[in-house]
A protein has these predicted regions:
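Non-transmembrane, amphipathic alpha-helical segments
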Residues: 1-5, 32-40, 117-121, 145, ...
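Amphipathic, well-ordered alpha-helical segments in soluble domains
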Residues: 12, 16-19, 43, 47, ...
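Short, hydrophobic, well-ordered secondary-structure elements
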Residues: 34-57
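Short, glycine/acidic-rich hinge or "gate" loops at secondary-structure transitions
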Residues: 60-68, 177-181
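Flexible secondary-structure boundary motifs
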Residues: 63-143
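Amphipathic, Lys/Arg-enriched alpha-helical patches that create a basic surface
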Residues: 120-135, 147-183
Length: 183
């Protein structure tokens, strides 16, 4: 589920910084590195927003059948320009988002995450990138310093992609059927 563009941005940043260092342009290399960190954070968070928004819309479409009014309502009032309100970015989990689909869904997701340390780490990476995105956008983009390396951002992105794929499964009607069987 990883995004090829983000992969290219990461490779471009590494290549450009290496080239500048080879030419002894340390100041330019440092500047480019700081810019690409912001680009990668925004690119990853934007990609996740796009995928999860589409997943929510697809879920609404599947469960609403031929009546598309609920889909339109969800797209207009829950998704468009509202994505970042679906999560509590100051927490290290996605409980707020999952609880929007009911307490049973939240509890089942939490149970599955607690049983799988890798998936739990993927959730934390997703939340961290969303938090960094908000800080960049709301805390003076030009001045804000992303206090992590390009490599760390890229690795968090890859890990967070796994969590976004998991959310797609949660937003499948079969997940609700599983809840009913487990309950």
């Amino acid at each position: 589920m990883e995004n090829d563009r983000i992969e290219r941005q990461y490779q471009d940043s590494k290549d450009l910084v290496a080239y500048l260092m080879e030419k002894s342009e340390v100041s330019f290399a440092t500047y480019i590195d700081s810019v690409y960190k912001k680009v990668l954070v925004l690119s990853a968070a934007s990609y996740f927003e796009s995928v999860i928004s589409k997943d929510i819309s697809a879920y609404a479409t599947k469960v609403s059948g031929s009546d598309k009014r609920i889909v339109t309502l969800i797209e207009n009032k829950a998704i468009k320009r509202q994505y970042h309100t679906l999560f509590d970015w100051d927490k290290n989990n996605t409980n707020k988002f999952c609880s929007l689909f009911g307490e049973n869904t939240k509890n089942k997701v939490r149970e599955q995450l607690d049983e799988n340390e890798h998936l739990k780490a993927a959730e934390r990476a997703f939340v961290e990138l969303g938090r960094q995105r908000n800080l960049l956008v709301h805390e003076n983009f030009a001045e804000y310093d992303v206090n992590t390396t390009v490599e760390e951002i890229y690795e968090k992105n890859k890990l967070a992609c796994e969590f976004v794929s998991y959310i797609e499964k949660v937003l499948d009607p079969s997940f609700v059927k599983q809840l009913a069987q487990d309950g």
